[in-house]
Amino acid sequence: MLYKLIYLFQTDISWLNVFRYITFRTILTTLTSLVIFFILGVWAIKRLRTMQVGQYVRDDGPPNHINKVGTPTMGGCLLLPIIMASTLFWAELENVFVWLVMFVIVCFGLIGFVDDYLKTIRKSSRGLSIKSKFPLQVLVALVGAIVLYLYPGFDSRLNVPFFKAITPDLGWAYIPMAVFIIVGASNAVNLTDGLDGLAIGPIIVAFSSYLVFAYLAGNVKTASYLQIPYVPGSGELTVLCGAVLGASLGFLWYNAYPAELFMGDVGSLPLGAVLG
């Protein structure tokens, strides 16, 4: 959005051409999401405490989990809007990959929000039942996988690390594999959330790596030089990864020991899905 407005003046103001570079916009989106989270983080924690939105833990859980009862949760309600706003500010909005990832973020975020909301009104660790949550996750992942598979120029070949000559074509089998990975990663991150920095730490490491690979795969020269698959348009995902990275670093400030805020299912489910 903001990138497009700046683009209109590039012919008149030469130094604005720097905004054409993905690396520069990635730095901006990382800083944008980081600063916004720092500014709004304290307000969000106070608001959640006022609304009595606290962490609920099963009675049979380990002692270090039980000690976290009452800590404000649903921090994802701040995390996700910051990620999306920063992405909308600095990303190329005509890129289908950006919109596909944001679709997954919104849908999994809504599933997580309903789950957290039910836990809050019931004042227990019971949210959405597995019979309700799992089919919804599979449906969203299935839509995303099908859209990606049908995208013109999409390559369903699987690249095996360290064996560049082995590239089996998955064909339609790519869709169920993608669904399995997306849903599995979503629930894996969800399971780790609940202790100080336990979920957000690996997320920061993972998205830092994704940021680099998205940039390399989206640049035909570097992809060819490093002999990695070239995916046209994927470079713009670097900007989105920067937004996730910045917001996650801001969240870590409040989630590190002693944790003042947890992301809840509304944050862990979509971040895990995007990770997948």
Identify the residue ranges that each predicted region occupies.
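Conserved ATP-binding subdomain of kinase catalytic cores across diverse folds
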Residues: G112-V114
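Divalent metal-coordination and catalytic microenvironments
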Residues: G75, D116, D265
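Membrane-interfacial loop-to-helix junctions in multi-pass inner-membrane proteins
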Residues: E94-M102, I121-L136
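Membrane interface segments of multi-pass transport proteins and intramembrane proteases
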Residues: K119-S129, V160-P168
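Select subsegments of transmembrane alpha-helices in polytopic membrane proteins
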Residues: K68-L80, K131-V140
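Alpha-helical transmembrane segments
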Residues: L2-W43, L79-L110, G144-L150, S156-F163, ...
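Cytosolic, membrane-interface loops and tails of multi-pass inner-membrane proteins
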Residues: W43-K68, Y117-R126
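N-terminal structured helix/loop subdomain that forms the ligand-binding/catalytic interface
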Residues: Y3-I13, T50-M51, P63-I66, M74
